[in-house]
Amino acid sequence: MKIIQYKNYVFSFLGKQNPLNNNSSQFLNCAFGKGDSNFRVRSNRKLVSKLFNNKKIIFVNQIHSSRIFFYDKTRPYDIKADGIITKNKNVLLGILTADCAPVILLGKEYFGILHVGWRGLLNNIILNAVNFFIKRGE
């Protein structure tokens, strides 16, 4: 696990290894539908939350698109998107990557994270996110 701090923001890049358990057979899979039970994935996500003062983690169901979800205070179930933007400093934003790239966006008030694959890149997910920030004076 790698943790980076920039100003008031903290970023973490998690691998499969569980930072709370040195047992090499304990993986920290946070993705549903990738081999672990839903119970195990939820437990792993709770462990990650625990590492960051039990803040709520906002995930979206990634669909390799250019869709971006704006999180304010409520999250409808099963949001399909590849980006999350918020100004709520009391939550964590989470995305999952393998061969796609994570892109982190920081403004004065808003912050976001994108899951960028070739489809999203081709369909301007980064440009859409940057325009969101610009329209809000970020």
Segment roles from a protein language model:
Residues Q26-D36, R40:
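Contiguous C-terminal substrate-recognition/catalytic subdomains in enzyme active sites
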Residues N18, G35, S43, N128:
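Short acidic/glycine-rich loops and adjacent helix/strand connectors
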Residues N23-L28, F70-D72:
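Short, glycine/acidic-enriched capping/hinge loops at junctions between secondary-structure elements
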